């Protein structure tokens, strides 16, 4: 009877080891959950960036204001009869 209890305890320990440390065990599950959380956060950031880019593309296709703004800021272009003033900081 004592031998049977020892064998059953050993088998139980093997199952517990596999449950906690084996493939698809608890530790593996926790690691996977952390990776999923990181990927969800990345996906959220990328989705927000995509929405901004899509809005900018729509504005460039449909509106003249976005094109004018880009021309003014990036290429320092002005309309006819318009004065361009550049304000710079003084270096001390």
Curated annotation (Swiss-Prot):
Residues 22-92 are periplasmic. Pfam families: DivIC (PF04977). The chain crosses the membrane at residues 4-21. It is a single-pass type II membrane protein. It is found in: Cell inner membrane. Signal peptide: none annotated. One of its GO terms (cellular component) is cell division site. It comes from the Bacteria. Residues 1-3 are cytoplasmic. Disulfide bonds: none annotated. Its main location: membrane. Residues 27-62 form a coiled coil. Keywords: Cell cycle, Cell division, Cell inner membrane, Cell membrane, Coiled coil, Membrane, Transmembrane, Transmembrane helix. GO terms for biological process: FtsZ-dependent cytokinesis. HAMAP family: FtsB. Belongs to the FtsB family. Part of a complex composed of FtsB, FtsL and FtsQ. Essential cell division protein. May link together the upstream cell division proteins, which are predominantly cytoplasmic, with the downstream cell division proteins, which are predominantly periplasmic. This is Cell division protein FtsB. The gene is ftsB.
